[in-house]
Amino acid sequence: MRKIIVGSRKSKLALTQTNWFIDQLKALGLPYEFEVKEIVTKGDVILDVTLSKVGGKGLFVKEIEHALLTKEIDMAVHSMKDMPAVLPEGLMIGCTPKRVDPRDAFISKSGASYKELAEGAILGTSSLRRSAQLLAARPDLQVKWIRGNIDTRLRKLKEEDYDAIILATAGLQRMGWDNEVITEHLDETLCVPAVGQGALAIECREDDKDLLQLLAHINDAVTEKTVAAERVFLHKLEGGCQVPIAGYATITENDAIELTALVGSMDGSVLLKETVVGTDPEKVGLEAADRLIKQGAKELILAANKGQQ
């Protein structure tokens, strides 16, 4: 019986996601056993600055990918939104399980909704994507950066001077906390989700054919297709955490992919947005990127990157 070593970050959410996925594999009843290896990533250690200032995408995966390449682990369970657009040679996303709720969750101290927040209220987020879109709709709000895992951020909301914070609904759902803490879900038209938000990425070595066959049982074709379009868009624009960038795709009634893509200025004063419909994930992602580039997306990205230096 083969033992599969599964790499995971140490946070409660990461381990919850990893153990959930292992349970899906165990339920297949095939002759494998599983062991979780906890790995500390750079993003877990550096908590005193915003994600955009310490390298953006890849912060939560590089050490885990190193363990995959050196064969310390056989596969890793990541949040898809943490994945860089390009993976190291020899590694691949071997499986995308069914996506859960991709929306952002608004959590306020008083129970007030986003629209009801008092003028000048303090909103906690570590995401340029969230802050740009929410400032575009409510320029009167003050954004204050907040870092840490889910439990830390919820504690900071209670104890510090934040009036509200924004978290991914998916993480709260996976922890079983969504019903008790979420004030409201932010509609995708108000705040377009991050590329891959709500989806998991199961990363493994390209040459591990045995494991890839096992993972194929859990793969969700719709999630794979929609996330692929989002990630092609992200790759074309070379956008990481250093710029407000968003992309969310769904499948239409006619089985086409509909991708809404967005790039914004840091302060939310400019939001470029396009919706593209097509059948091929790569073509849809590239088309969305090209349309935004024509609107001036590259200039916004350059300006954002200069602002981070």
From Swiss-Prot:
Top-rank taxon: Bacteria
Cofactor: record remark: Binds 1 dipyrromethane group covalently.
GO cellular component, one term: cytoplasm
GO biological process: protoporphyrinogen IX biosynthetic process
Cofactor: dipyrromethane
Enzyme class: transferase
Keyword vocabulary terms for this entry: Porphyrin biosynthesis, Transferase
Catalysed reactions listed for this entry: 4 porphobilinogen + H2O = hydroxymethylbilane + 4 NH4(+)
Modified residues (S-(dipyrrolylmethanemethyl)cysteine): 241
Its EC number(s): 2.5.1.61
InterPro entries according to UniProt: HemC, Porphobilin_deaminase_cofac_BS, Porphobilin_deaminase_N, Porphobilinogen_deaminase_C, Porphobilinogen_deaminase_C_sf
A GO MF label: hydroxymethylbilane synthase activity
UniProt pathway: Porphyrin-containing compound metabolism; protoporphyrin-IX biosynthesis; coproporphyrinogen-III from 5-aminolevulinate: step 2/4
Subunit structure: Monomer.
Role this protein plays: Tetrapolymerization of the monopyrrole PBG into the hydroxymethylbilane pre-uroporphyrinogen in several discrete steps.
Family to which the UniProt record says this protein belongs: Belongs to the HMBS family.
UniProt miscellaneous comment: The porphobilinogen subunits are added to the dipyrromethane group.
Official protein name in the record: Porphobilinogen deaminase
Species, as recorded: Bacillus anthracis
Organismal lineage: Bacteria, Bacillati, Bacillota, Bacilli, Bacillales
